[in-house]
Structures are given as structure tokens and as C-alpha cells.
Design a protein with these regions (language model features):
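Glycine-rich phosphate-binding loops at beta-strand->alpha-helix junctions
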Residues: 68-85
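Flexible beta->alpha loop and helix N-cap segments adjacent to enzyme active/binding sites
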Residues: 1-25, 29-30, 82-227
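A general structural motif
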Residues: 46-48, 77, 131
């Protein structure tokens, strides 16, 4: 992250934490000759460091009878940062709503207005497409090394595809990565979300500290069986 110090100098005030300028409209031609990957890595490093400071501060308030954390805001979708933060080991439990950005805040507003807790059971709150989930058809296509598009049941509330509006593929074989990216028309560095039975997850992945499962695609995890 070669531009990390430049970002702090030009954009971030650390004590007290604040941005030196409004960045919602972008950064213009700042560092116009920078390699985009270097720039992205630097922004990620600064983000993780700033969030770490905030989490440490939050943990100081958590000792008053509750050591759990509810984490929200658009930055809570940053899976790489979430792994770093969880590995700090500051909280017993961490909960992130599947739609932690502005749209998800609407649920909090409703709960606050009604003065009631939300009975959260699942993230499938959107439009419903009726019918049986096509398990056998999906298995058949995956065995033939094909990609499968699924649109069944109620849509996920949030930006993550969690099974009801999803593209599924067999992860075995390097060519599948390029095929998924081609169909989605996205960059080659984009991440993928594995789906695995909860009881088998520790056999294949090294989850962050305190994370027993991640059903809403909120953390990165190291694969423990090589490349």
C-alpha cells in the first residue's frame, strides 16, 4: 500500500477521526499516475486501520454487561476488513445485518419508531417467485460443469446473492472462475463466495476468530487445502 501515507496526509484526520474533505464526489485527478491496484490496496489499508481504531474504542464501552457488537454501515460489506476486525478478538459475538447500508437502516428506523425489536429469521424479504427449489436440476447441471442461474422464492434483502437469486457453479477447476466473471461482465479480481455445509466448514476454511459461520457472505476466509 504505497500511497497509504499520502491518503492520511491529504484526506484523513486521525485525532479526532474525521475526513479532511468531502469524498462523496471522488478524488478527481489525485495521484493520476498511480497504478489502480496500488491505489486500491492503499485505500483498503487505511480503511482497515481506521476501523481498527474505532473497534478498539467501541470495545472499551462493551464491558458494561455486554461484550457483543452489532456492526452496520456500508463499510460493513467490506469482507476483507471484516476478517481483520474479527481477528482482533475484541467481542464475543458480532452481528452484521445482510443489508448494512442505507437500505438496511430502514429496518432500524421502523424498529425505533415502533419501539419494538425486529424478529430476524432470514434475509429473504423481497419479491416472491413461487415453486419448488430445483435441487435435482441444479445437481444435474453442476455435474456437467455448467453454470446455473437460480431465481426461486423471495429475493434476498441486500446486495449479496444468497441462494434465491444466484449463479451457481462447481468450484473445481480453474476455468470456472473466468467463466463466471465473463457471464457477470466483471473484473478478474472479483471474489467468489463458496457454499458449504456448516458442519464441514472448518475442514476447508480457516474462519476469523469468533466466527462460526458466515451465511450472509460477510467475511473472507483462507482455504486450508492449498490453491
Amino acid at each position: 500500500p504505497k500511497y497509504k501515507d499520502n491518503i492520511y496526509n491529504d484526506f484523513v484526520e486521525r485525532k479526532p477521526f474525521r475526513l479532511k474533505r468531502n469524498l462523496h464526489k471522488g478524488i478527481g485527478n489525485w495521484q493520476p499516475n498511480a497504478d489502480v491496484m496500488d491505489l486500491a490496496a492503499s485505500i483498503q489499508a487505511v480503511t482497515e486501520e481506521c476501523l481498527t481504531e474505532l473497534w478498539i474504542k467501541a470495545s472499551r464501552y462493551a464491558g458494561f454487561g455486554n461484550n457483543n457488537l452489532v456492526y452496520a454501515g456500508g463499510v460493513a460489506l467490506n469482507c476483507a476488513a471484516n476478517k481483520v476486525l474479527a481477528n482482533l478478538g475484541l467481542f464475543d459475538k458480532i452481528w452484521i445485518i445482510p443489508n448494512p447500508g442505507d437500505a438496511g437502516s430502514s429496518l432500524g428506523c421502523i424498529a425505533a419508531n415502533e419501539n419494538k425489536q425486529i424478529n430476524w429469521n432470514h434475509p429473504f424479504l423481497g419479491h416472491n417467485i413461487e415453486g419448488e427449489y430445483p435441487v435435482d436440476a441444479i445437481i444435474k447441471e453442476l455435474k456437467e460443469n455448467k453454470m446455473v442461474g437460480v431465481a426461486n422464492g423471495r429475493a434476498e434483502f441486500g446486495p449479496r446473492a444468497l441462494g434465491n437469486r444466484s449463479l451457481l457453479a462447481d468450484p473445481r477447476g480453474p476455468e470456472i472462475k473466468d467463466l463466471v466473471n465473463k457471464i457477470k461482465r466483471r473484473q478478474k479480481f472479483r471474489p467468489f463466495a463458496p457454499a458449504i455445509l456448516e458442519e464441514d466448514v472448518n475442514d476447508y476454511f480457516d474462519l476469523p476468530i469468533g466466527v462460526k459461520n458466515t451465511p450472509y457472505m460477510q467475511y473472507t476466509a483462507a482455504y486450508t487445502h492449498g490453491n
